[in-house]
Amino acid sequence: MSGIDLEKIKEETIAALNELLEAASLKAGDILVLGCSTSEVSGGVIGKASNEEAGRTIVSALLSVLEPKGIFLAVQGCEHINRALVIEKESQEKYGFEEVSVVPALHAGGAASLAAYNLFKSPVMIEHVRAHAGIDIGDTEIGMHVKFVQVPVRLKTKYIGSARLTALKSRPKLIGGERAVYEKVL
C-alpha cells in the first residue's frame, strides 16, 4: 500500500488538466509535457521515494482525457536519464524528434516516465520536445520542454497529493517594433 489516496490523486490530476486545457486551447496533434515527482506527491523529497502506483495513477488519468482529444502526452524523466522523455512513436515521427536509447526505470527516469513507457501503445524515448503546454507536479522544471514563449498558467488546483503544481502554456513570439500589429486585421 502506498499510503496515499490514489482516487484523490486521480481527481486532482484530471481537475488540473482540464483547467490547463481550457487556458491553453490545445487541439488534436498538440503535445502536453508532464514533469512529475511521485516522491513529492507522496510527501517525500524529490528523487528519494518514487511511487509506482502514483505514477501509474497520474499518467493513466492524463491519458484518459488527452487520448480522446488526440493530444499527445510526453513524460519527462529525471536527471539520471538527462530528462529524456517518453512519447508515442506517432508523435515522435510527426514532429521529427530524434529517438534516443534509454529505458526508464523507477530510480532512473522515475515512476511517471516508467508508467508512461508501460502504458503507451508504442513508446519511444527522445531527448528534447517542443510541447505546446505542460504540467509540472513537484517542481521538476519542465520549462526546457515547452516551446517559446512560455506563459505561466495559474490553476485553482495547487497540489497533486503533497506536490506543488505549476503549469505552462505557450504563445507565438510578438515581434516587430512600434508599428507592429498583434491582432489580426480582417
Curated annotation (Swiss-Prot):
Pfam families per record: DUF436 (PF04260)
InterPro entries xrefs: Antibiotic_NAT-like (IPR028345), DUF436 (IPR006340)
Family per record: Belongs to the UPF0340 family.
Family matches, as NCBIfam families: TIGR01440 family protein
Name used for this protein in its record: UPF0340 protein TDE_1278
Organism whose genome encodes this protein: Treponema denticola (strain ATCC 35405 / DSM 14222 / CIP 103919 / JCM 8153 / KCTC 15104)
